């Protein structure tokens, strides 16, 4: 028995193949969509997943303005932020965030960011996410060898 064939192969930046995935957010629940996108960005579905390497795909979310929230979460859910100064805690509801310029993109990025690791790798993974409020988008085109596909689960 050859013991060398049983060694675990760890992915690195040179061996990772990144694809472009287009996800349509029309009538999808915000949290469930965010979880699927975070899994795609992280690359957890790939057989050569390595926790400390960016082995996920590039994700393009279209129709971000058509995402839905169940119940009365548009007004009841509160996102907190802190300016760093005394009395600087700010509250934002999804309805008020959507009303701002680029609010749909900011809302989806905020949700996905909360589902990624809170470290340097998580910040790099967030750069692989492109969010557009409408169907028409201008994004970096896929490189040679990369494919564009629509996942059946997302």
Language-model features: locations:
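Ribosome large-subunit tunnel/peptidyl-transferase-proximal elements
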Residues: 2-84, 89-106
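Polyanion-binding loop/helix "lid" in catalytic or ligand-binding cores
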Residues: 104-115
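Conserved small/polar residues in nucleotide/adenosyl-binding loops
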Residues: 137-142
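Hydrophobic alpha-helical segments, chiefly the membrane-spanning helices
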Residues: 150-154
């Amino acid at each position: 028995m050859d013991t060398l064939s049983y060694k675990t192969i760890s992915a690195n930046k040179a061996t990772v193949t990144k694809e472009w995935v287009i996800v349509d957010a029309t009538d999808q629940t915000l949290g469930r969509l965010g979880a699927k996108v975070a899994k795609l960005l992280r690359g957890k579905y790939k057989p050569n997943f390595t926790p400390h390497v960016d082995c996920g795909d590039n994700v393009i979310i279209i129709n971000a303005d058509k995402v839905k929230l169940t119940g009365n979460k548009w007004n009841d859910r509160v996102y907190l932020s802190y300016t760093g100064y005394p009395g600087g805690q700010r509250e934002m509801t999804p309805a008020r965030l959507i009303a701002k310029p680029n609010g749909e993109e900011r809302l989806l990025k905020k949700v996905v960011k909360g589902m990624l690791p809170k470290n340097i790798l998580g910040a790099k993974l967030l750069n692989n996410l492109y969010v557009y409020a409408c169907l028409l988008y201008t994004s970096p085109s896929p490189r040679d060898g990369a494919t564009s596909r629509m996942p059946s689960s997302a």
